[in-house]
Amino acid sequence: MLPSKILLIGRNYADHVQEVFNQSASTLPPTLFMKPPTSIIGPGAAIKIPDFAQKVEFEGEIALVISKPCKNVKKENWRDVVLGLTIVNDVSDRNLQFAEGQWTRGKGIDLSLIHI
């Protein structure tokens, strides 16, 4: 079963912000972006880099898995909706990612979010 959407937070790690953006994390706040369900592949599956990709990079991430549709969950009720944590490998084409104001094209390549 694939999720209906995948929400991610970017620029949330100070050293990585400095490395990728050459700016301090205090001057460049975190941002929210999405990956489509078609970006998911399973453990051990081959990453298929598209021919048009020019600057492909990857990042290990911790993913929070939500078990059911939810909205406005009170913090004391988080266990009602959180299934667990997992590790993913977030693959991006940096040229596409930074060519526009938002990151969907560079982060949303099919088969670019690997569940480990």
Model-identified regions with their sequence ranges:
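Short helix/loop capping segments that flank catalytic or ligand/cofactor-binding pockets
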Residues: 17-18, 43, 73-75, 95-97
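Short Gly/aromatic-enriched secondary-structure transition segments
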Residues: 20-30, 75-86
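Short loop segments at secondary-structure junctions
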Residues: 37-38, 67-71, 91-92
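Residues embedded in well-ordered beta-strands
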Residues: 61-65, 86
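Extended, compositionally biased flexible segments
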Residues: 1-60
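Flexible glycine-rich active-site/ligand-binding loops centered on an Asp-His dyad
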Residues: 34-35, 77-110
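A generic local secondary-structure boundary/capping motif
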Residues: 20-22, 48-56, 70-77, 102-107
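Conserved small/polar residues in nucleotide/adenosyl-binding loops
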Residues: 114-116
